[in-house]
Structure formats: structure tokens, C-alpha cells
Amino acid sequence: MSKQADEVMSKFTPDVETKKVDTSRKLKIGIIGTGWIAESHILSYKKMPDVEIVAAADLIPGKAEAFMKKFGVEGVRFYPSHKELIDNEELDGVSVCTYNTAHKEPTIYALEHGVNVLLEKPFTVTLDEAIEVCRAEKKSGKILTIGFQPRNDANMKMIKRIVDSG
């Protein structure tokens, strides 16, 4: 494996130190990018009583507002960019739901500003970007996780039923 590939793979090795989030209050979450993939994030967050969506950003004027209205999420502040959202809010985390080619910048910016990140897959589109994101995560001490949990996928449920049946 190359040195770069080793560095990326080391990201997926558990750290000895466990990172913690204060769960004594509702977690304040921002949504960056309000396209179709953000729908699954919103629907999941709405099921969590200890999570509050407080802000959303999208480059297309009015898109974030329409998105939140569609899902009945009220009291959200809207921003035209991820930088303005992160600079103006006290957040526990953000969901980065932008185009695949635009994952790196908001992820690194959030981490550098002390915000945990749930990054939609794919992680990045190049190895160099992946290394930059991994370095930012390690330097920040914040949590970065990738949103790929297919446990509710119909195919996965069928596979689980088959496995469980013996």
C-alpha cells in the first residue's frame, strides 16, 4: 500500500481515545445542502427527541426554506453558504449533504471550527481529498462519520431474514 493509502486506512482504525458529545441537552444540528439525500437525514433527525435542527444552508436561494417547510421543520435559520451557517450558529454537528464533488470544503471547514460532521457518502472523490479530510478530523479532535448505514434498505432486511432463518 502507498503511504497515502496507509494514512487513509489508518482513519478507519479505532482510536484509543473515545470522543464524547454532551448528551445532557438537545443536540443542535445544521444541514448543509438540501437536495434529495438530505431527506433521509431530516426524516431520521425528526425521529430523535434529543436532536434539534437549527439551521440549513443551500446555494440555491429559497431551496433550504422550501425543503424545511416540506418536512414540517420550523424555527430553522437559513444561510446561503456553509461558511455563514457555521460562523453564525452554535452547532453540535452538521450533516454534509452536498454534491459528491463538494464534500471536502464544508467538511474541513466544520471540523476546523469545532463542529462534528456526519458526511454523506462518498467520503470524497479523490484520495488527496480524503487525506485532507482525515488530517482535518485528526487535528480537530471532533467526530467525523460517514452516512452509510443500509440497515433499513429492503435488500438488507431480506438478507437479514435469510441469515436469521438459518
Where are these regions (language model features)?
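N-terminal Rossmann-like dinucleotide-binding module
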Residues: 2-73
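Structural signature of beta-strand start/N-cap positions in the alpha/beta core
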Residues: 28, 52-55, 90-93, 116, ...
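Acidic-histidine catalytic/liganding microenvironments
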Residues: 48, 88-89, 153
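Short, conserved SAM-binding/catalytic segment
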Residues: 66-75, 132, 136-140
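Beta-loop-alpha module in the N-terminal Rossmann-like domain of NAD(P)-dependent dehydrogenases
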Residues: 76-136
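A contiguous active-site-proximal alpha/beta segment in oxidoreductase catalytic domains
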Residues: 124-166
